Amino acid sequence: MTGAMAQTKLNIVLCGFMGCGKSTVGKKLSQMTQMEFVDMDGYIEKRAGMKSPDIFEKHGEGFFRDLEHEAAVELSQRGGYVVATGGGALTFQRNVDAFKEGGVIVLLDTPLRVLQLRLKNDRNRPLLQRPDRFRFIRELHQKRMPLYRRAADVVIPTKGSPNAVCRQVLQALEEKNLTNS
C-alpha cells in the first residue's frame, strides 16, 4: 500500500476542525506513504512572503481566500501530496471542487470536548484570542462540521494514536479503491 501511494498522483487531503490533528497525522501519513507533506497555510505563507495573520490584516480575508484557492488548484494539478488544509479552506465549494479533482478528501472527526481541551491553552491561533473562546469554538464547530462532512470522501474518527489514525486512513482509502493502485 505505501509503495503504491508513493507512485500515485492522487492527493490525500486532510480536513477537520482546528486541533483535530491534521498536521500531526499528515506528517506521519507522509512518512508512511512516502508522499510529500504540505501544510496549506504554510504553503500560502511561503508564496505570499508573510504570515497568514499579516495577509488578513494587510490585504483582507478575500485576498487570503484567493491565495488559498490558487494553492488548492496548484496542488491538485501537481498531485502526489498529503495536504493538511486550513480550517476554513473547505468551507468554500471552489476549494472542495479543486481538491476533489486531484485527490481524496479525508475528514479527521474529533469530538468537540476533545477539541476544546486541546485548544484550551493554544496561544498560536489568532481566532482564539478572545474571552469567549469556548462559545466561539462551539459555534464555529457547529457551522463548519456539516461543510466538512459534505466535502469528505472518507470520515475517520480520531480515536487512538496518530499512527493508528494513519492506518485507519490508509485502510479506508484502500477499501474504497481511492488509491489509484
What residues fall within each predicted segment?
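NTP-dependent small-molecule kinase module
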Residues: 2-8, 28, 32, 78, ...
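Hydrophobic anchor at the beta1->P-loop junction of P-loop NTPases
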Residues: 14
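P-loop (Walker A) phosphate-binding loop of NTP-binding proteins
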Residues: 17
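ATP-binding Walker
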Residues: 20
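Walker A/P-loop
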Residues: 23
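Conserved substrate/cofactor phosphate-moiety recognition/catalytic segment
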Residues: 31-70
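Glycine-rich phosphate-binding loop used to anchor ATP phosphates in small-molecule kinases
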Residues: 63-108
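A glycine- and Lys/Arg-enriched "phosphate-lid" helix/loop adjacent to the NTP-binding pocket
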Residues: 101-146
